[in-house]
């Protein structure tokens, strides 16, 4: 019969050791909860941390940027500026379109923001032009967020106007109804319309004006209430043929009579079915297409949204004619799924490596099975808590679980090693489990809570970076906490049932060889440790030098914000001279497209030319380049971008700007390159003075690449200067002049054709093919007060001037954005420093305000808080350790291990050519929590030896180091191998995972070597200091 230790032996583990059935069932419950939770967890690339963002688009065809700014954007901005919770408001006013982007505070629900935006639009309605074709339309979408899915609709048999009509009514509306979809845009602008092209000479010969034609059309095509007849027996609804539906109907329309003969519209104009806007076009590869871009709502799960669209597509395409082909050209979820799969594989690999290292040290199958059960149980149990907290399976949470693999096994290893030690001394398994678990319980609690304490500052990081890493920190903390519970319950219970003196003594050739090897290693370590303890000041000097080296490396290592990911999609902007026409721009775009499609890494391409809510100017073309899957191409995205830019450099008159799409989108504007810097002023004149010199200086900086500005003030404008006195004498008002010009050159939407499914427009313009350019103004005719026809040139002169192609505002003030990339041999930190130096050298006046935007602004914010984040982690850990040890001194001894981890991590990043970005900083903070466990295990046993066996401090710490050498080495290697798959990652999303693995592997390798020697030395030095203080202040010590 086994003699059990006293009832108090075993600590918190005693109940679970003595009740194996209850313990087993409790663990099964945790396992089942985790498995069920996993099935309900959504999948995404990163935690959902989007700012609530709403875009408001107002179209005013034919209006110049100045008119759009003053008549539409400014009234809207004044109302939007009064909304509570608004973080930033930016706007872009271009020819015919106003786009206002509203970014709200993270804490404001998107639905609340939507209500405020709608109220502001309603308040501004009376201030907007009365002839707006449509009121402002808002969408819950961030315009800078790349589409989650891009579809191309093509047909070789049906006109594109009919294709767009079918897509808009049958496909786009249904996709818009999918939960999570924020906006569906149809690039290509081929909405059906009846186009009326006036023949200026024919109208003039008949003594008519364009205003006469416009009035006749609007009066002839109406759709209004007519009432009903209600008689004694029945009611009759009234209707009439007041609607004209086809181009032929309009062609036969009588617009005037002369000498008793009718003048029909077809006599003075060509009337045909066409597109509502003839200056828009989209292409899929090199085929004319309607390109459908689907963007998600901020905060919506991208995987769920894309899956819903995929399920719906077959049914939607069945409703289209067979000649209409719908092709999915890009789906961001493909790379997201691949990235998550790669991370899941690395997680499984980490578990396998950790179990392998356990067997290598324990050399016993039953002893290996125990932590082999504890690791997956701790990780799977975490899924249940993640569901409760509304987390998702994403790259960061999977990275947390991968790193946790090395953490969670530590507790089980420490418990097993301690229980095995007593069994090898001859204790019975049950007694050894009670005694070993009770002895190690405080160490497990210290390890767990001190490690969780390191993660606490991550929960208080501000802004979007804090939200981003909250899931990472909480997931890791939960896994560590569950691991501690498992290690104090299931692990000792399994040790009591599965381990025995015979099983531990049973050895094969490998076991005997490895045992001899470890004994020799421990003996060598013991000899070196004795020498180190005899030279404490030299060792202390080494420890202090690591602290100094950490500070030096921290200052000089290149710094970045977030790794640039290879998601297989490149966003591009093609820039041409500011006065380029639509036809010329379309031709240049086709030349560039043919070059891009020849690249072996490119799978498909979509491009768009024209001005609408997504493209600000006619001299810009938008491109989306879809690359082949990573395993089907030889080069990463940055290499492909460099190659494409070099190839396009040979095309005259264009500049191509490219940037890879990212899962993390902080910007609210679509810029040409990755990072933005803004200049804001009180007037456009101030910007025109200071933008060119700053731009030229930045373009000369080697730390910057692809520097460009959205400041475009060299667009050609015809300024019509009316002699108001002459016009007034003839009875011609400025409204008459504006109407005549708008009728001729504005693609004016003058009437609406209503059908059961949709509404179509009648577009009025002047045929300028015979008289292109400024000569077309000679054909403009006005009606005087006496009914005479007056040429515009009789009362006005025309001057050619330059004008901005668009007017941009930031928080209601004029702004220009300078975009830039960072060359491969420089970091974002160096680029930011170069921009700030260039700014200081120019000595801007006080009315010029500068600011980084988007990722570069977040980088500045994160860089400023990084040092405080590390300090907060150290302070939090000191407080927890001080409370646990009831000592001011011992926590300092434990924390003395931290500089070695910092040196190792920073050196590894520097040697690997990686930047110190937020991912790497998280790794360093985790190292703070990991490396101190070596000191905790040493100090716990040294203090116990001093207290219970009366050993002197030197002998106690020496024996503790030798006794704990094997579990220290085992746990460190387990943590290192847990991070190794991340460091060696090569698949999709590897850019995100690799910095974390590099920093942790480097830090663990160096700290493992140094802390085995520096910790005992510092322990003895602080012990001497403590004794000195006790002798110096005995009364205070007694009172304490």
UniProtKB/Swiss-Prot annotation:
Record's subunit section: Part of a tripartite efflux system composed of MdtA, MdtB and MdtC. MdtB forms a heteromultimer with MdtC.
UniProt source species: Klebsiella pneumoniae (strain 342)
Cellular compartments annotated: Cell inner membrane
Molecular function via GO: xenobiotic transmembrane transporter activity
Protein name as annotated: Multidrug resistance protein MdtB
Protein family: Belongs to the resistance-nodulation-cell division (RND) (TC 2.A.6) family. MdtB subfamily.
Main location group: membrane
Gene Ontology cellular component terms for the protein in this record: plasma membrane
Short name of any one Pfam family annotated for the protein: ACR_tran
InterPro entries, alphabetized: AcrB_DN_DC_subdom (IPR027463), Acrflvin-R (IPR001036), Multidrug-R_MdtB (IPR022831)
Key words of the record: Cell inner membrane, Cell membrane, Membrane, Transmembrane, Transmembrane helix, Transport
Annotated transmembrane regions: 16-36, 342-362, 369-389, 396-416, 440-460, 472-492, 537-557, 863-883, 888-908, 911-931, 968-988, 998-1018
Membrane association type: Multi-pass membrane protein
């Amino acid at each position: 019969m086994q003699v059990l230790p006293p009832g108090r032996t075993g600590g918190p583990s005693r109940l679970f050791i003595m009740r194996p059935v209850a313990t087993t069932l409790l663990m099964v419950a945790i396992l089942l909860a985790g498995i069920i939770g996993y099935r309900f967890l959504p999948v995404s690339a990163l935690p959902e941390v989007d700012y609530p963002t709403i875009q408001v688009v107002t179209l005013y065809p034919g209006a110049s940027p100045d008119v759009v700014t003053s008549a539409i954007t400014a009234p809207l901005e004044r109302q939007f500026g009064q909304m509570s919770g608004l973080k930033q408001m930016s706007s872009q006013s271009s020819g015919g379109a106003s786009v206002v982007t509203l970014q709200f505070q993270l804490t404001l629900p998107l639905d609340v923001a939507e209500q405020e935006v709608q109220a502001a639009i309603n308040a501004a309605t009376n201030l907007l032009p009365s002839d707006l074709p449509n009121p402002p339309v808002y969408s819950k979408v961030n315009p800078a967020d790349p589409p989650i899915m891009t579809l191309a609709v093509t047909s070789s048999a049906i006109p594109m106007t009919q294709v767009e009509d079918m897509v808009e009514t049958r496909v786009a509306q249904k996709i818009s109804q999918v939960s999570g979809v924020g906006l569906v845009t149809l690039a290509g602008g081929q909405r059906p319309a009846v186009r009326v092209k006036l023949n200026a000479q024919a109208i003039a010969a008949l003594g008519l004006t364009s205003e006469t034609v416009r009035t006749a059309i609007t009066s002839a095509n109406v759709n209004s209430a007519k009432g009903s007849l209600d008689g004694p027996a029945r009611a009759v609804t009234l209707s009439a043929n007041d609607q004209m539906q086809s181009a032929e109907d309009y062609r036969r329309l009588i617009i005037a009579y002369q000498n008793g003969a009718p003048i029909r519209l077809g006599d003075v104009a060509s009337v045909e079915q066409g597109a509502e806007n003839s200056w828009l076009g989209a292409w899929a590869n090199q085929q004319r297409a309607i390109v459908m871009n689907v963007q998600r709502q901020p905060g919506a799960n991208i995987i769920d949204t894309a899956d819903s669209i995929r399920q719906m597509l077959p049914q939607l395409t069945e409703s289209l004619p067979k000649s209409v082909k719908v092709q999915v050209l890009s789906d961001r979820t493909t790379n997201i799924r691949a990235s998550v799969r790669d991370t899941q594989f690395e997680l499984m690999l980490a578990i396998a490596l950790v179990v392998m290292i356990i067997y290598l040290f324990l050399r016993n199958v039953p002893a290996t099975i125990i932590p082999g059960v504890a690791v997956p149980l701790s990780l799977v149990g975490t899924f249940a808590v993640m569901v409760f907290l509304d987390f998702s399976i994403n790259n960061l949470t999977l990275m947390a679980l991968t790193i946790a693999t090395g953490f969670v096994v530590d507790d089980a290893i420490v418990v097993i090693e301690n229980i095995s030690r007593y069994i090898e001394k001859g204790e019975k398994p049950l007694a050894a489990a009670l005694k070993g678990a009770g002895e190690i319980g405080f160490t497990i609690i210290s390890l767990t809570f001190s490690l969780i304490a390191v993660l606490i500052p991550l929960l208080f990081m501000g802004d979007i970076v804090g939200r981003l890493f909250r899931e990472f920190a909480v997931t890791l903390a939960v896994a560590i906490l569950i691991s501690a519970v498992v290690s104090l319950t299931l692990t000792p219970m399994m040790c009591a049932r599965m381990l025995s003196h015979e099983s531990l003594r049973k050895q094969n050739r490998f076991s005997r060889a490895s045992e001899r090897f470890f004994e020799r290693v421990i003996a060598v370590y013991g000899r070196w440790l004795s020498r180190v303890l005899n030279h404490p000041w030299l060792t202390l000097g080494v420890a202090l030098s690591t602290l100094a080296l950490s500070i030096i490396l921290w200052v000089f290592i290149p710094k970045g914000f977030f790794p640039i990911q290879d998601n297989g999609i490149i966003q591009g902007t093609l820039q041409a001279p500011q006065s380029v026409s639509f036809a010329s721009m379309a031709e240049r775009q086709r030349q560039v497209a043919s070059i891009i499609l020849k690249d072996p890494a490119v799978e498909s391409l979509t491009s768009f030319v024209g001005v609408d809510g997504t493209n600000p100017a006619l001299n810009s073309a938008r491109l989306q380049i879809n690359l082949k899957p990573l395993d089907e191409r030889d080069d990463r995205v940055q290499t492909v971008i460099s190659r494409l830019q070099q190839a396009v450099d040979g095309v005259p008159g264009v500049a191509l700007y490219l940037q890879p799409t990212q899962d993390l989108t902080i910007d609210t504007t679509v810029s040409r390159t990755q990072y933005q810097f803004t200049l804001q002023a009180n007037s456009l004149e101030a910007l025109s003075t200071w933008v060119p010199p700053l731009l030229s200086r930045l373009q000369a900086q080697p730390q910057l690449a692809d520097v460009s500005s959205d400041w475009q003030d060299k667009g050609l404008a015809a300024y019509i200067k009316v002699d108001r006195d002459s016009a007034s004498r003839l009875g011609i008002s400025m409204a008459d002049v504006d109407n005549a010009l708008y009728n001729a050159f504005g693609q004016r939407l003058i009437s609406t054709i209503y059908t059961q499914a949709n509404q179509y427009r009648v577009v009025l313009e002047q045929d300028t093919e015979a008289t292109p350019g400024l000569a077309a103004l000679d054909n403009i005719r006005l009606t005087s007060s006496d009914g005479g026809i007056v040429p515009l040139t009789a009362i006005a002169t025309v001057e050619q001037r330059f004008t901005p192609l668009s007017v941009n505002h930031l928080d209601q003030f004029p702004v220009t954005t300078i975009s830039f990339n960072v060359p491969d041999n420089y970091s974002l930190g160096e680029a930011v420093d170069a921009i700030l130096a260039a700014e200081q050298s120019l000595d801007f006046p006080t009315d010029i305000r500068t600011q980084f935007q988007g990722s570069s602004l977040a980088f500045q914010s994160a860089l400023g808080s990084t040092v405080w984040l590390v300090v907060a982690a150290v302070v939090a850990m000191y407080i927890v350790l001080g409370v646990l040890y009831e000592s001011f001194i011992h926590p300092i001894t434990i924390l003395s291990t931290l500089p070695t981890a910092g040196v190792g991590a920073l050196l590894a990043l520097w040697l690997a050519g990686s930047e110190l970005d937020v991912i790497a900083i998280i790794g360093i903070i985790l190292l703070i929590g990991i490396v101190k466990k070596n000191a905790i295990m040493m100090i716990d046993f040294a203090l116990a030896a001093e207290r219970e066996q009366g050993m002197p401090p030197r002998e106690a710490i020496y024996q503790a180091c030798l006794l704990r050498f094997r579990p220290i080495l085992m746990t460190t290697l387990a943590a290192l191998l847990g991070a190794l798959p991340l460091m060696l990652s090569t698949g999709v999303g590897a850019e995100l995972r690799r910095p974390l693995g590099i920093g942790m592997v480097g830090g663990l390798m160096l700290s493992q070597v140094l802390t085995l020697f520096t910790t005992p030395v510092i322990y003895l030095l602080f012990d001497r200091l403590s004794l000195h203080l006790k002798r110096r202040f005995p009364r205070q010590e007694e009172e304490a």
